Amino acid sequence: MIERGKFRSLTLINWNGFFARTFDLDELVTTLSGGNGAGKSTTMAAFVTALIPDLTLLHFRNTTEAGATSGSRDKGLHGKLKAGVCYSMLDTINSRHQRVVVGVRLQQVAGRDRKVDIKPFAIQGLPMSVQPTQLVTETLSERQARVLPLNELKDKLEAMEGVQFKQFNSITDYHSLMFDLGIIARRLRSASDRSKFYRLIEASLYGGISSAITRSLRDYLLPENSGVRKAFQDMEAALRENRMTLEAIRVTQSDRDLFKHLISEATNYVAADYMRHANERRVHLDKALEFRRELHTSRQQLAAEQYKHVDMARELAEHNGAEGDLEADYQAASDHLNLVQTALRQQEKIERYEADLDELQIRLEEQNEVVAEAIERQEENEARAEAAELEVDELKSQLADYQQALDVQQTRAIQYNQAIAALNRAKELCHLPDLTADSAAEWLETFQAKELEATEKMLSLEQKMSMAQTAHSQFEQAYQLVVAINGPLARNEAWDVARELLREGVDQRHLAEQVQPLRMRLSELEQRLREQQEAERLLADFCKRQGKNFDIDELEALHQELEARIASLSDSVSNAREERMTLRQEQEQLQSRIQSLMRRAPVWLAAQNSLNQLSEQCGEEFSSSQDVTEYLQQLLEREREAIVERDEVGARKNAVDEEIERLSQPGGSEDQRLNALAERFGGVLLSEIYDDVSLEDAPYFSALYGPSRHAIVVPDLSQVTEHLEGLTDCPEDLYLIEGDPQSFDDSVFSVDELEKAVVVKIADRQWRYSRFPEVPLFGRAARESRIESLHAEREVLSERFATLSFDVQKTQRLHQAFSRFIGSHLAVAFESDPEAEIRQLNSRRVELERALSNHENDNQQQRIQFEQAKEGVTALNRILPRLNLLADDSLADRVDEIRERLDEAQEAARFVQQFGNQLAKLEPIVSVLQSDPEQFEQLKEDYAYSQQMQRDARQQAFALTEVVQRRAHFSYSDSAEMLSGNSDLNEKLRERLEQAEAERTRAREALRGHAAQLSQYNQVLASLKSSYDTKKELLNDLQRELQDIGVRADSGAEERARIRRDELHAQLSNNRSRRNQLEKALTFCEAEMDNLTRKLRKLERDYFEMREQVVTAKAGWCAVMRMVKDNGVERRLHRRELAYLSADDLRSMSDKALGALRLAVADNEHLRDVLRMSEDPKRPERKIQFFVAVYQHLRERIRQDIIRTDDPVEAIEQMEIELSRLTEELTSREQKLAISSRSVANIIRKTIQREQNRIRMLNQGLQSVSFGQVNSVRLNVNVRETHAMLLDVLSEQHEQHQDLFNSNRLTFSEALAKLYQRLNPQIDMGQRTPQTIGEELLDYRNYLEMEVEVNRGSDGWLRAESGALSTGEAIGTGMSILVMVVQSWEDESRRLRGKDISPCRLLFLDEAARLDARSIATLFELCERLQMQLIIAAPENISPEKGTTYKLVRKVFQNTEHVHVVGLRGFAPQLPETLPGTDEAPSQAS
C-alpha cells in the first residue's frame, strides 16, 4: 500500500513570542494547550500562512470576531510578527519518502497601512539530519543568533550538494509544486481554488458549520469534469475551425460570385449599350424614311387646309352680315313681347281693381245705412239718459231737502220749498209766469198734446227723410257711373249722355265678339308668311351653296338628280369601307402576328442560347427534343455510376478514418469503456504495459495474447469480484489478468513458438493456435506504422473521392442544366425562327400600308362629294314642301287687312272690358237721372228742428208733471200731518230714487254700448271710404298707364309675340351656331395650318438631321464592329434577345450594371480607369475596350493548375463545382464533429450518477460519526428540477428544439443556454451571455443540489444548521464535512498527480474545549481511520490521552516576551509510532 504523506514539523522564526521554534507534529493529533494569549492561535496562523501565502485571503480574527465581516486593520498577521525577517516553514515527507520543506519569508512593511511582504519558497533534497531552524538562523554566540535573509538562505542552500531551492513569484506555482509533491490534496489553479482551500482551513480552524462551505458544497465535493468540458471545448473548437474553413470557402465563393458578378454586369453593361446602338441605328434609318413620308403627306395636307380655309372665311363673312339684322329683329320682338306681357298684367290689375271697387261700393252703401240707424239710436239713448239723470237729481234734491227738514223740524217748509222750486222750474221751462199749482194740471194736458203733436210731426219728417235719401243715393250712383264712363259733365246732361253710352255699348260688344276669330285667322296667315320667308331664305342659301340660281320649277328635277348621285356615291363609299376594313383586318392580323412573334422571339433566342451552351458542354448536337431526352437518360446513367463509385470510395475512406481514430487512442485501447473499467478496478490495460514493444516483436506478442491482448491487469482478482456483479457497460468479452503492472511479464502462459505462429497452452486440455498477424497492432510502434500506411491510403482515397465528387457534381450540374432547359425551353427550342417570319411579315405590312394610303386618298374625295350631295338633298327636302308658299304673292296683303280689322275689334273689346260693368250697372237705374233731388238738405234741417221741438215739449211736460205731482205740498198745514206725510214721502222718494238710479244706470250702459258701436261703425265707414278712394285713384292710374303703353292686350297677343320672338331667336341661334362652328373650324383650320407649317419645318429639320446622324453613326458603328470581331466577343455582346427591348430598358439595364460595376472595380485601379473612360456616350468603342479588359483581367486570375481553360465563364463554372464539393465535404465533417443533444444528456446523467454513487460511498464512512445527540451525518444530493427537465428534453424531446442545435449561428453551448431559457422563462439570467450560461450547463455540478443532514436524537434527519445544534455538535458535524471534502479532493486529484503519491491530510481546531471527551475521542478515531493529522488548540484543563500535546506558556523576561513550550506524548495503552524527530520521553524546549 502507498503510504500517506505527513507533515513532520512546523517552524516559526521571529514571530511574536517565538524566535526560532519547531513544533514536531504528531501523525494523528497535535494539541496546543495553554491559557489565553499563550500563542496557540499564532502557531496555527503561522501554519496557515505557510500553507496559503495569499494576503487577499489571510484574515486571523479573534474568536469574538467570528461574526464580523472585517477584523483588525492588518487582518491579524502584522501584529503576530516581529520586526525584521520572519519565516514560517513546514517540513513534510511524502509517499515517495521525499523530504520537502515549504515555507514563506515574511517581513513587515513600514507605513501606516501595516502591510506584510510574503515570499514563498521550497527546499528539496534536504538531508533528514538538518533541522529547519539550522537553515534560516546563524549562531552568533552562545545566546545570540541571527535570522538569515532570503538571499543568504538561497546562497547557503545552493552551497549544499543535492539540495534544491526554489523561490516562487506566484502563489499558483508554489501550490502547483506542493500538489505535485503530495503536500496539498488539490491543485489550486486560480484564486477561486485558493479561496476554497482557505475557507476550508478557516472553517476547521474556528470550528462549527461553515456557511461559506455548506452553501457551495458542490464546488468543494464534486470534482470538475474537465474531460467532458475539454471534449466540448475541443468539439466547439473543431466546429469553429470547420466553420472558419466554410467561411473561407464562402469568401472564395464570394470571390467567385464577384467574378461571376463582374462578368455578368460587364456583359449587361456593354451588351445593353451595344444592342442599344444597333437598335438605334436601325431605328434611325426607319425614322429617316418615316420623316420623308410624313414630309410628303404634310405638304399635301397643308394645301388641302388652305383651300378649305378660303371657303370657310367666305361663308363666315356672310353669316356675320346676317347676324346683325337678326339681332335687331330679335330685340324688337323681345321688346314687343315685354310690352304685351306688361299690358296684360295691367289689364289684369284693372279688372281686379274694378271688381274690388264694385264690392267696396256695395259695402259702403250698406255701412252708411248702418251708421244712420246707429246715430238715431244714439240720440234716443242720450235723451233717455239725460231724462234719467234729471230725475235722479231731482229725487236726490228732494230727498236731501226732506232730510234737512227732518233735522230742523221744518219738514213742511222744505216740502213747500220743493214744490215752489218745481213750480218755478216749470214756469221757466214752459214760459208760463202765471203758472200756479192749481192751473198746472190744465197746462199739463196742453203741453202733453203739444208733445204728441211734435212727435207725430217728427215721425212724418223722418219718413220723408228716408225716402229722399234713397232717391238721392240712386241718382248719385247713376251720375257717378256716367262720369266714370264719359268723364265730367253737368248734372242736367247726365240723362242724355247715359242713353248715348248705352247705345254705343251694344255696338262695341258686337265688335268685341269678333276678336278671337280674327286673331286665329291672323295667326294662321302670319305663320304662313313666316314659312314663306323661311323657304325663301333656304332657297337663297341652297343656291349660294350650289353656286347657281335655280327657279322654283327646276327644284324637283334637281332633287331627283342629287338622290341618284347619292345612291351611286353611297355604293362606292360602302365598297370602299369594306375594302378598307379588309385591308385593316389584314394589317391588324399582321401586326398581331408580328407582336406575338416579337414576344416569342426573346424566348426562342434564350432557348437557342441555352441549347448552344448545352451542345458546347456535352459536345453533342441536338436536332429535336427527343435527342435531348435521350441524352438526359444517358447522363442520368453516368451520374448513377459515378455516385456509386464515389460512395464506395467514401465508405472506404470513412472506414480508414475510423480505424485511424481507433488506433490513435492512448494506451492502445480500442474501446473507451476499457479505460474506465481499468480505472474502476485499479488496474492497467495490457496494451498500455506493452505499449513500448518494438515493431519486430509486435506480431509475436499479438499472437501470444490473442483475444486477451485487450485485457486489464489488476493486482488482485479477488478485489475485482465485487465490481463484476451487475456489470453491463463493458465489452462482450472482458479479460482480467492478475499481476503487478510495474513488473509484469509473459510467464503466465506456456508457449511454443512455430513458424510465423505460436501455440499457447492455456490449460492441460485447452490450447490456442495463433498465427502472426500480417498487420500487427500490438504496441505503439505497430500502431504508428499502421496509422502511417492508413494515412497514405487515405490520401489516395481522398484524391480519388475528390475527383469522383467533382465529376458527380459536374454531371449533376449538367443534369440540372438539361432539366432547366427541358422545363423552360424545350417547348420552343426546336420551333421555326420567329425573326425570319417577322421579316417576311414586315415587308407585307409595308405593302398594305401603301395600299391603305392610296385607298384613303380616293375615298376622301368620294366622301366629300357624297357629303355635298347629301347636304343638297337635305336642303331640298326642306324647300320642296313649301313651293306653294313661294308662289303665293298676296299673302302679305291679306295679313295686313286682317291685322287692321283685328285692331278695331280689339279696341272695342278693350272698351267693353273697361266699361262693361259700369254700363251693366247703369242700365237698370238710368231712369233716376231724369229728376234731381235738390231739397234733400232742407228736409234734413226740418227733421232736425222737429226733433228739437219734440225734445223741448217732452221736458216741459215732465216739469209740469212734477208740479202736478207736488200739488199736495201746497196744502200742508199742520206739523203732525206733515210728519206723518213726510214719513210716507220719504219712503216713496227713496223707492223712486232707487228706480231712477237703476234707470239711469241702464241708460248710461246703453249709451256707452251704442256709442262704442257707433264709433266702430264710423271707423268701418271711414276705412271703406279710404279704400274706395285709394283703389279708385289706382284704377285711374292703371288705365292711364295702359293707354300710355299703346298695345292691345288680348289673350292671343302674348302667344303671337312669343312665337315671333322664338322664331327669330331660333334663326339667330342657328346663325350664331353656324358662325361659331365656322369660327372654330376656321380657328382650327388656321391652327392646323400653323401646326402643319411648323410640322413641315420640324420634319424638314429632323429629316436632314436624321440623315446626317445616320451618315455620321455609320463610321463609328463600323469601328465598333471591327473591334468586336477582332477581339472575338461578338458572341457575348450580340445578344439578339435584347433587340426586342426598348432603348429606355436597355439604358436602364446598362446604368444599373454601371452602378454595380463601380462598386465591383472600386479596388482595381486599372479597371476603374477603363470603366470611367467607357462612360463617355459619344465613344461606344470604349465600352468594348472595357469588356475586353475585364476578360483579360479574369483570364490572368485563373489558376491553370486547378482550372484548365482560358474562358472566364467556364472557369467560374468549374470553380463553382469545386467549391460546392468542398462545402459539401466540410458540412459532412461538421455533422460528424457535432455531438448530439442526447449524447450530452447521457454524458451528464452518467456523470451525475457516478458522483451520486461516490457521495453515497462517502456517506458510508460518516454513518458511525456521532457528536453529542448527533448519531450520524450524511450528504443529500438531488438533481434540480429545472435542470432535470432540461436533461429530459435533451434526451427525449430534442427533435422539438432542433432549430437551436441545427443553427450555424449558435455554438452548442449557446444553443443549450437558449433551450434552458426557453424551458424556464421565469428565471432571470441577468447580464450573463448565452455562451457563459451554456458552459455552466455543461458542468454537471450545476445540475445538483447538496445539503448536509444530521440524525439528531428524536428529531430524526434534519438539515445541519448551527442554530439547530449545540456548539460541540456543530463543531463535530463541521469537521465531518471538512473531512469529506478533503477526501473528495483527493479522489478528484488522483488522476492529475502520480499514482504513487497519497497527499497529506491535516485540519485544525481552535478552542477545542467546546467539545466533550466523547466528541474528542470521536475525532481521534476519525483521524486514525482516515490517516489524517489534526492540530487542536485547547485550554489548560484538556489533556488528551492520544497524540502529542504542547504546553504553551507566555512569559516576559527583561522586557522580552517569549513562549515557553513543553511537549508531551500521549500515555494511552496503545501508543502510536514515535514521531519523527522526537524522543519517547517528554521533551522541553526553551
From Swiss-Prot:
One Gene Ontology term of the molecular function aspect: DNA binding
Keyword Cell cycle: yes
Any one GO BP annotation for this protein: chromosome segregation
Keywords associated with the record: ATP-binding, Cell cycle, Cell division, Chromosome partition, Coiled coil, Cytoplasm, DNA condensation, DNA-binding, Nucleotide-binding
Disulfide links within the chain: none
Region Flexible hinge, annotated ranges: 666-783
Residue sites binding ATP per the record: 34-41
Subunit architecture: Homodimerization via its hinge domain. Binds to DNA via its C-terminal region. Interacts, and probably forms a ternary complex, with MukE and MukF via its C-terminal region. The complex formation is stimulated by calcium or magnesium. Interacts with tubulin-related protein FtsZ.
Function summary: Plays a central role in chromosome condensation, segregation and cell cycle progression. Functions as a homodimer, which is essential for chromosome partition. Involved in negative DNA supercoiling in vivo, and by this means organize and compact chromosomes. May achieve or facilitate chromosome segregation by condensation DNA from both sides of a centrally located replisome during cell division.
NCBIfam families: PRK04863.1
Protein name in the entry: Chromosome partition protein MukB
Lineage per the UniProt record: Bacteria, Pseudomonadati, Pseudomonadota, Gammaproteobacteria, Enterobacterales
Gene that this polypeptide is encoded by: mukB
